[in-house]
């Protein structure tokens, strides 16, 4: 498969206000793409636009809540109006939680699913006609939690597993029309997503995140993602930890579960925000 060039392409990145999304936008811009930076934080994407324009790159920043399908449709329409086309959609917007299910309000899990899964669905649905016309590319930012279990993040893992089912099925629908779909699965990244994670009561968690392996920088992960997109990768495991998790979880799933739980179980026991509504009575 020939290497895809992004020079002159229009790339829409959700969650582009900071962290991995901003780094992805900067990497695509460095490859010559026109950037449409979408984020709920209007000031953050306006800052990115100013940075890219100072480098001589074209960028349109748009405030957008990806949980609103109409807002996603307006963002896609604005991108096409400004640049005449849309070639690449990067579904990066996301959030996390850190709490055991027993201590998690169901509204937290619904919120995570709305942002991580339905946000990607909304944007992809809106962009699909233009992507088909342009024989474009959809990138879905998943996670190691998209193909393995992850303790204390049941809702987050469910949202990432759902992305795989959705986009791998979509690939079979749009491949005949020349549209490519890439799943990118980073391991832990040093960004705000886990610093802003919700606890079981929907408030920001108060305890520090536990990681496996050395967290990637956003720039390092973004470089791999853009390079993988150019090569036409279907599945991109980003970072050594992601590769190890993939193989161990498939060759020895029970071993993987024990190792992962041993490392991360402290997140269930480190003073998470709690939403228990009943008290366990001591045995007589």
Question: Model regions: which residues?
Answer:
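SDR active-site lid
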Residues: 176-240
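Residue(s) in the substrate-gating loop at a strand-loop-helix junction
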Residues: 143
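Active-site helix of classical SDR
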Residues: 124, 159
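Conserved glycine-rich Rossmann-like NAD(P)H-binding loop of the short-chain dehydrogenase/reductase
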Residues: 31-48
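Substrate-binding pocket helix/loop in short-chain dehydrogenase/reductase
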Residues: 100-101, 105-110
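The beta1-alpha1 cofactor-binding region of Rossmann-like NAD(H)/NADP(H)-dependent oxidoreductases
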Residues: 42-43, 63-74, 106
């Amino acid at each position: 498969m020939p290497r895809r060039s992004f020079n002159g392409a229009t790339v829409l990145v959700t969650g582009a206000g900071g962290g991995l999304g901003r780094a992805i936008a900067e990497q695509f811009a460095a490859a010559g793409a026109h950037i449409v930076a979408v984020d709920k934080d209007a000031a953050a994407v306006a800052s990115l636009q100013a940075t890219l324009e100072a480098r001589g790159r074209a960028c349109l920043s748009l405030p957008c809540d990806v949980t609103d399908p109409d807002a996603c449709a307006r963002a896609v329409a604005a991108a096409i109006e400004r640049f005449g086309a849309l070639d690449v959609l990067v579904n990066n917007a996301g959030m996390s939680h850190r709490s055991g299910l027993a201590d998690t309000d169901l509204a937290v899990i619904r919120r995570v699913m709305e942002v991580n899964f339905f946000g990607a669905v909304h944007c992809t649905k809106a962009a699909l006609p233009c992507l088909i016309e342009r024989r474009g590319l959809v990138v879905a930012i998943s996670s190691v939690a998209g193909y393995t279990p992850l303790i204390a993040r049941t809702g987050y893992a469910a949202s990432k597993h759902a992305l795989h089912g959705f986009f791998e099925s979509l690939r079979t629908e749009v491949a005949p029309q020349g549209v490519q779909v890439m799943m990118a699965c980073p391991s832990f990244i040093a960004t705000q997503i886990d610093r802003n994670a919700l606890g079981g009561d929907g408030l920001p968690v108060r305890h520090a995140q536990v990681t496996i392996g050395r967290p990637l920088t956003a720039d390092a992960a973004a470089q791999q993602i853009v390079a993988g997109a150019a090569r036409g990768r279907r599945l991109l495991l980003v970072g050594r930890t992601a590769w190890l998790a993939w193989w161990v979880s498939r060759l020895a799933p029970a071993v993987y579960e024990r190792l992962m739980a041993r490392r991360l179980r402290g997140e269930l026991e480190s003073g998470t925000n709690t939403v228990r509504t009943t008290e366990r009575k001591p045995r007589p």
